[in-house]
Amino acid sequence: MQPDRLDLHALHHFRTRSPLTHCMTNDVVQTFTANVLLALGASPAMVIEAEEAEQFAAMADALLINVGTLTAPRAQAMRRAIEGAMAAGKPWTLDPVAVGALSYRTRFCQQILSLKPAAIRGNASEILALAGMSAGGRGVDTTDTASSALPAAIALARQTHAIVAVTGEVDYVTDGQRTQTITGGDVMMTRVVGTGCALSAVVAASCSLPGDRLNNVAAACGFMKQAGSVAVKESRGPGSFASAFIDALWNLEAQA
């Protein structure tokens, strides 16, 4: 999948605006997430202390809430960060990692849905569970297909007024009325930890860009799919794929 004009327009905004993206993400993926954002032209920051998180969320252009390694103190810090972002009119994005499979994070994510996320990005099982249509998958792994979760994504978008991206072999991005389909990528993306979480950070950054938010989130998904398609041709396994993936993001304009 080559980036189209819309994707390149969004990429131009990434590169020229360098959105400061506050990533309250899980401990496993922080470095990879930061490198993905940097390769696209965004500016990552990982601030987790509750008092600082609230302050920084108000300064940043966008906030990501990823519950992959959620703890009670971190949940408190995330709430405060969301409050800071909302008070400053900054968009925040939810990545409901393993929601439906684990009870504490499921309750937490259901509670913060009322705080008006700009976007929600999850796999099929997570989106189904968050929409109240399924018990969830096997931890961070999905047991459903993205297409099977599309009705749940549409319902969740209508309920929350957020852009919902349900991702997998094919990605679907919806605002509850319009839906975009993004193809491409490679199965190797599932063999490197953090590609989904990093996508959520790119989605968060995209929510701060001017223009149609649905299109910007779809463009974010397209960037990652395109990089995966390129990286698999330049790599010999998961280790080299991760490096090639970052390089492919960096070189997106040259590939268009």
UniProtKB/Swiss-Prot annotation:
Taxonomy of the source species: Bacteria, Pseudomonadati, Pseudomonadota, Gammaproteobacteria, Enterobacterales
Function: Catalyzes the phosphorylation of the hydroxyl group of 4-methyl-5-beta-hydroxyethylthiazole (THZ).
Binding of ATP, residues: R121, T167
The keyword Metal-binding is assigned to this record: yes
GO BP of this protein: thiamine biosynthetic process; thiamine diphosphate biosynthetic process
Broad class of enzyme this protein falls into: transferase
Coiled coil regions in record: none
Residues of the signal peptide: none
Catalyzed reactions: 5-(2-hydroxyethyl)-4-methylthiazole + ATP = 4-methyl-5-(2-phosphooxyethyl)-thiazole + ADP + H(+)
Keyword Nuclease appears in the UniProt entry: no
The protein's name in its UniProt record: Hydroxyethylthiazole kinase
Organism: Enterobacter sp. (strain 638)
Gene3D superfamilies (UniProt xref): 3.40.1190.20
Family to which the UniProt record says this protein belongs: Belongs to the Thz kinase family.
UniProt pathway annotation: Cofactor biosynthesis; thiamine diphosphate biosynthesis; 4-methyl-5-(2-phosphoethyl)-thiazole from 5-(2-hydroxyethyl)-4-methylthiazole: step 1/1
Cofactor: Mg(2+)
UniProt entry keywords in alphabetical sequence: ATP-binding, Kinase, Magnesium, Metal-binding, Nucleotide-binding, Thiamine biosynthesis, Transferase
Protein EC: 2.7.1.50
Residues the entry annotates as binding substrate: M46, G194
An example molecular function term from Gene Ontology annotations: ATP binding
